[in-house]
Amino acid sequence: MKKIDVKILDSRIGNEFPLPTYATEGSAGLDLRALIDESFEIQPGETKLIPTGLSIYIADPNLAAVILPRSGLGHKHGIVLGNLVGLIDSDYQGPLMVSMWNRGNEPFKIEVGDRIAQLVFVPVVQAEFNIVEDFQQTERGEGGFGHSGKQ
C-alpha cells in the first residue's frame, strides 16, 4: 500500500470523526466528510464549497487523486459534484474541498460529519505529443458518438 502525506486541518478528525479509511478490502475510495461548523441546506440549483478538514501531498508525479460523488447522494437526492470530478495533482498541498451541487427539486441538508464524496488515487501517465501528418488507419477510424451501436 502506498503512503500519502496527510495534514489534519480540523481537530475533530481523529476525535469525533475517523481519518478516512477503506470500508472494505475491495473499496477503491476513501469517504470524505463535511467538516463544517453547523448543518445547512443546499437549495435546488445551488452549489456550495465544503471543507473536508484535510489536505494531502501525493508527491509522486505518477499518481493523482480524484474526488468523486457518492452514488447514493446523486441517485436518491440529486446531489452531485459541482465540477463533476475534482482532480488533485501530485504537487497540490492545499485543503481538500468538495463542490456540491443540488440538481434536485428539494433542499438537501448537510450535517456536520456527513460523508459527502470519495477520494480515489489513480495512476498518471504524462504524455508528450508527436506531430504526424496522418495516423495509421484503424477499423474504427473517425467513428464516434454512437458509432459502435446500441446493443
Swiss-Prot record:
One of its GO terms (biological process) is dUTP catabolic process. It comes from the Bacteria. Pfam families: dUTPase. Keywords: Hydrolase, Magnesium, Metal-binding, Nucleotide metabolism. GO terms for molecular function: dUTP diphosphatase activity; magnesium ion binding. It catalyses: dUTP + H2O = dUMP + diphosphate + H(+). This enzyme is involved in nucleotide metabolism: it produces dUMP, the immediate precursor of thymidine nucleotides and it decreases the intracellular concentration of dUTP so that uracil cannot be incorporated into DNA. This is Deoxyuridine 5'-triphosphate nucleotidohydrolase.
